[in-house]
């Protein structure tokens, strides 16, 4: 009987919620021949991930979990990134790659620069699952978009290695810098939350809410739905960390509200005509966006370069091959073409 081959590499997943488990299910595939270790403060989450086959072993201590790992993926909330980085920094082996998936990059890159030795490499990533969320057994990130964000002066080989995760997950890649990413998050993630908050406060703190709450229907409920299952400390930390970008986005939102108030100051017929035009334009634009969002990988899919498999990348990066800088340049060129 032939003995099983030694694992090509070791991967550690810190954070075993829905996304961390989905990443594990992709990386623990037998054909990749990787040893996947999981770590989560929630023992129940770790047990479920182990039982699902997303990880091969549970380690309660994050530092021990990272010892000897070639790749460490942080799938934890933004508020937990800094303490996790500080907790694992001394355990990381030379040339280990740490991929963090938080929704803000500038602060996480600063924390990594303070905590991690120079010969350990951090790369930012953010996964946008397609909508609607696929039903099992379809993987969560099938046809998703993996945004890759590189810190200044980052190692190009580590960046290429991170890019290899995308096809393993069934996702496509898109490259942006940290400032651009955080600015986009201010508009697409943080501004909607604050507008939901402002809508709720504008209505509930005005005279008449005592009676108004009885007649408020699904329109108001949907407009304030982002407040439903919110983790207030985590959300507040994100908003505060991105406050400069968010303040600019609020300024743009105020300009739009002022324009709407100007329209409402006209006569009834003119107001209705102008509002109808704006509503139709917004409805059509949103429809196009939702159609594209359902399959973000369709954009210029034929421009994605051929790159070695993740298994080959493990072998090449961690001792069995040479630098792959030409490959990552091709990946960057393809991503740049997507933006044009």
What are these regions (language model features)?
Residues 211-287:
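Interdomain hinge/lid region at the active-site interface
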Residues 62-97, 147:
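Rossmann-like NAD(P)-binding element
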Residues 250, 257, 261-265, 271-340:
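NAD(P)-dependent dehydrogenase/reductase Rossmann-like domain
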Residues 89-111:
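ADP-ribose/adenylate-binding Rossmann-like module
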Residues 2-61, 67:
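NAD(P)+-binding Rossmann beta1-loop-alpha1 motif at the extreme N-terminus of oxidoreductases
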Residues 156-169, 180-207, 213-231, 247-255:
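Active-site-proximal catalytic alpha-helix in oxidoreductases
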Residues 112-185:
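Rossmann-fold dinucleotide-binding core
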Residues 33, 93-96, 118-120:
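A short helix->loop->beta-strand "cap" motif at the edges of active sites that frequently abuts
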